[in-house]
A protein has these predicted regions:
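Glycosyltransferase donor-sugar binding loop
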Residues: 47-52, 211-212, 243, 267-282, ...
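An aromatic- and histidine-rich active-site surface loop
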Residues: 90-102, 113-146, 324
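Membrane-proximal helix-turn-helix segments that form the acceptor-binding/catalytic region
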Residues: 159-177
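A short, active-site helix/loop in glycosyltransferases that binds the activated sugar's phosphate group
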Residues: 172-203, 211-216, 404
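Acidic donor-binding loop of glycosyltransferase active sites
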Residues: 308-324, 337-338
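N-terminal strand-loop element at the rim of the active site
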Residues: 5-7, 12-21, 34-88, 184-191, ...
Length: 410
């Protein structure tokens, strides 16, 4: 393959797909979207071909099919990796298989100076192998260390121990750690300074995630919106909202329990890709199906519709307790006026005084819901204005993607 030296090839490994609700999936979608006409960068994106959170490109507009396992979207080459159902090891298998595919492609096509950007610290035991292999091919390894994968509630104690060790190994065998939170960058230096290759400190930089501040193109009487409201039995400013991956550390159990305990007459709309096992577990604990206000409304891939649903929510819940700068939170600050966040350092770092906070103890969120259910509209408007000002100053996707361009092509 003939290639011009000025084009920087960047291989993105770690996101399951593009345009779903996970942080990395949102990031990859936006990064490729903002750089789709950038002649200096060519992205190659690994996607899951099967299983939980897998890529379904039929739900995206503007896809050009190359083969059964490859397609082009936002001018990025997206390649699908089949993952056998091997339990918790799936995530490790996926990243290893994707990296092997990257190395094969780089070698076969004679790509000069590639960057392989790995998202999350899942493959520590293989980090040295791939670091050396990619360096031998003339490339560099960049890492997004995510936010404390070893703390996530869904993992058992042995698996959490593995993630912690894996994190240390991956930070050691990387050329640059791109942290999406100041707290994460600080943590890396506190834990891993003098533990890099030959006792060096890890090289880090901070680039947050972004949000789109433009209003939805849909009007309040748009048929798509009205049909969705009718189907889900919701109405404007009469529902609390959450959008995010359906995993325990995102506080779904607490949010549902506390909403059920509140006196609100509004609904609680949950936009997520439901995991039946976790859903069944929540039903056994909470019996939420008896509360007609609790509504699992499925997924929304139409970005304009999703934006309008956010704008029209009475309030937004954010229960993420693990991770850095979460895209779903920034999108909420940019589109929903009233945001109710679990009180952890990452969320405080992003939202500061533009949101209201609750803790995970029983009664905290229910009390806050009862309070804000009757809050003065002027107060809501004031919080919304402050939130949008904060996002426009620090977290626009243009600003974030411009920073990534500088890191990738410098």
């Amino acid at each position: 393959m003939q290639q011009e030296r000025k084009v920087q090839h960047v291989f993105l490994v770690g996101a399951k797909s593009l345009g779903a609700y996970g942080g990395y999936e949102t990031f990859v979608y936006k990064l490729t979207e903002y750089h789709q006409n950038n002649k200096n960068i060519k992205y190659h994106v690994a996607c899951k071909a099967n299983g939980d959170g897998c890529m379904d490109e039929s739900k995206l507009d503007g896809v050009r099919k190359i083969s059964d396992t490859e397609f082009e979207f936002h001018n990025a080459r997206c390649f699908k990796i089949y993952v056998p159902q091997v339990g918790a090891a799936q995530a490790i298998y996926y990243d290893v298989a994707a990296l092997n595919e990257c190395c094969k492609y780089i070698e076969k096509n004679g790509i000069k100076n590639p960057i392989v950007y790995i998202m999350a610290c899942r493959i520590g035991p293989f980090a040295k192998h791939f670091y050396k292999k990619i360096h031998k091919l003339g490339g560099r390894v960049y890492l997004n260390p995510d936010g404390h994968e070893w703390m996530r509630a869904k993992w058992s104690a042995p698996i959490r121990k593995y993630w912690k060790i894996s994190e240390q190994m991956m930070i050691k065998w990387s050329d640059l750690d791109i942290c999406d939170s100041v707290n994460i960058e600080k943590y890396i230096h506190e834990c891993y300074d003098r533990k890099g290759i030959k006792g060096r400190n890890p090289k880090t930089t901070f680039i947050a995630y972004g949000a789109d501040l433009t209003l939805s193109k849909l009007s309040d009487d748009d048929k798509r919106l009205l049909n969705w409201y009718k189907e889900k039995e919701l109405s404007k400013k009469d529902y609390y909202l959450v959008v995010g991956r359906f995993v325990p550390e995102n506080s779904f159990e607490i949010m549902i329990r506390e909403f059920m305990a509140s006196n609100s007459k509004r609904d609680f709309a949950i936009i997520t890709n439901v995991n039946e096992k976790f859903l069944g577990e929540l039903e056994r604990k909470l019996h939420f199906k008896q509360d007609k206000r609790i509504k699992f409304v499925g997924t929304v891939y139409d970005q304009e519709l999703l934006k309008k649903i956010r704008e029209n929510a009475y309030a937004y819940f954010h229960g993420h307790t693990v991770g850095g700068t979460n895209p779903s939170l920034i999108e909420a600050l940019g589109s929903t006026d009233l945001n109710l966040l679990v009180d952890v350092g990452f969320n405080q770092e992003v939202a500061k005084d533009t949101a209201l906070y609750w803790n995970r103890s029983q009664g905290s969120l229910a009390q806050l819901i009862n309070k804000v259910d009757n809050i003065e509209n002027d107060k809501i408007i004031e919080l919304g204005k402050k939130a949008k000002e904060r996002v426009s100053k620090e977290y626009t996707w243009k600003k974030i993607c411009d920073k990534y361009e500088k890191v990738f092509v410098k």
